[in-house]
Amino acid sequence: MDADFIRELFAEFGDVHIRRMFGGAGLYAGAVMFGLVSDDLIYLKADEETAPAFERERCAPFTYTTKHGKRALMSYWRLPDRLYDDPTELALWARQALAAARKGAAKKPPSKARTRRKKS
């Protein structure tokens, strides 16, 4: 999916940064990833409060197959097709995705600094 198209699509939401990752791209507002692009589909971050709205729209969560052949489910849901033509409502959904991403990041414990082993 073209980066200019994504920026135009999210223009009413605000400045979106796109970072390539794992064959797709992450959608960022500042340092917070609130969405992703995979196989030309956009997915937005959801939590227990916002996931039901995606379910009502019959949207599926993002899944991938691990290196061990298991299917992994992530808390990103496919953007409803109708939002591609409604920038105002898309901006609302994007703000909710950003709030869910911030809430999820706040729940995570801070990462431990890696220590170097002493050579013997």
Where are the regions that the model predicts?
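Charge-dense, helix-prone N-terminal extensions
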Residues: M1-S120
